[in-house]
């Protein structure tokens, strides 16, 4: 892989499409208890309700925003300099970390001295890595268990609430019908949360910093914020919070450049990616990762065994603990926020996969299975797990305990190998928690719908409610090219049952490396699944956006319908294919039914008739039916009549 010349040139910049604000949206910041807690949100402005519908004011709707400074017109974006170090002051003021005099990893030092890669390096970083002072633990879980509410926790509480209280208050003061309007727009169906404590009749009406602290201390949620990634905006992953979505990017040995991967990252977060995993396996993994981290406002995850394998020329049996340890330190000092580590692939489970239709499909799982068989012993990941914990808590890197034995077909779902590994991951979680290391659990995979809840229930039981992070699951194997849909079905279900973060699947799954369009399709599909899960659980305020869009639809506010949706561009494009003129944006019909058969237009006609006659809507319908009956009989009572 060669570097993209434009990306490395003096005027390198991200794709203009990734930094333009979304239609009728602007970046706003909500300040917390201190001036440097400025939480970003996207404000979507709305048009007033037309006079024919009552002439109401429709205040802006606020939504969760993962795009970082890229969608802020006032921010100066220079990818060669990276993003501002948002959390640097918070990290330093705690007094439990130190700036290192140099790089701790042997590989990092070798790479820094390698003249062949000099032109590829990120040169905008002018600080050295930080690490916990000897004997200190700098994880957010450690602070939470000591009763400390960190700035990150307050930031998250503000972010999760999405200014819902302010929105409802603005409705109340919008006019004479404000109280009624607020009650209508704030209405939400009761959810079924399957035991998640934040929801239900006695649940929360808003997320508080103390609640964030409690959930992190309990291990039910994680805040993936490496101290060497101060550019990241704090976010939380847990079943009592909004369901999150991860996007996978990364180069391979045969395609893609550093520049393309940075573009994919900014594109993914524009459309709602809450975290991004860099799964690069080609050349220049180290340099690609540095560029991505320095320009990412969301947590970055990796699978360190991929790079470790590159260091031994792809021979799994040549991997050692020493090489892997050095790779962990290298990536921790770059700022990786969570590591996928397949420590649950034990020697005793490998033979169980022989009965499978598709064997071991996890890349990391197959690497470790091969190592176990070659050496006929437990993997160094399992044997050195406590040593890994020592590294994690020195930088606040979170575990994403990998499901190396996940099923690669619905035939293999919920088999002995998969569930055996899951039980081991639960045991490893307890060890990680003993060190106050934040931990989430990765899950399948390919699972038919009737077996999905069993996966969730066993994970909650065996892993003691540690956050579950699942790939889909795909609910059928018959749709290559459409696996974003086969998996989106499973993602919505398992998100409802309790999964905290969904790993997106693109249309290219099983077929090739996704491009930017595939990334967007995957993100939108999974934001939809995550939101459906939030609605089903009864997350406080989850229905606000649905209510706002439904009201806009009923009032034929077309632009507001587009802009309140997950993909305004696509909605506008589809509408304009058949009704491209500006006049169609205020029409009281669309191309589906036309002007005479629009159900919402008919409903409005009934309401107007009721108002004119001084009767209720039901009475108006009855009167209207009587009039139409007389007309029908006068015309000969024929179903089909000449015009």
UniProtKB/Swiss-Prot annotation:
Substrate binds at residues 248, 277, 306, 342, 362-364, 403-406, 442, 469. One of its GO terms (cellular component) is cytosol. Gene3D superfamilies: 6.10.250.620, Radical SAM ThiC family, central domain. [4Fe-4S] cluster binds at residues 590, 593, 598. Pathway: Cofactor biosynthesis; thiamine diphosphate biosynthesis. InterPro entries: ThiC, ThiC-associated_dom, ThiC/Bza_core_dom, ThiC/BzaA/B. Keywords: 4Fe-4S, Iron, Iron-sulfur, Lyase, Metal-binding, S-adenosyl-L-methionine, Thiamine biosynthesis, Zinc. Binds 1 [4Fe-4S] cluster per subunit. The cluster is coordinated with 3 cysteines and an exchangeable S-adenosyl-L-methionine. HAMAP family: ThiC (MF_00089). This is Phosphomethylpyrimidine synthase. It comes from Paraburkholderia phytofirmans (strain DSM 17436 / LMG 22146 / PsJN) (Burkholderia phytofirmans).
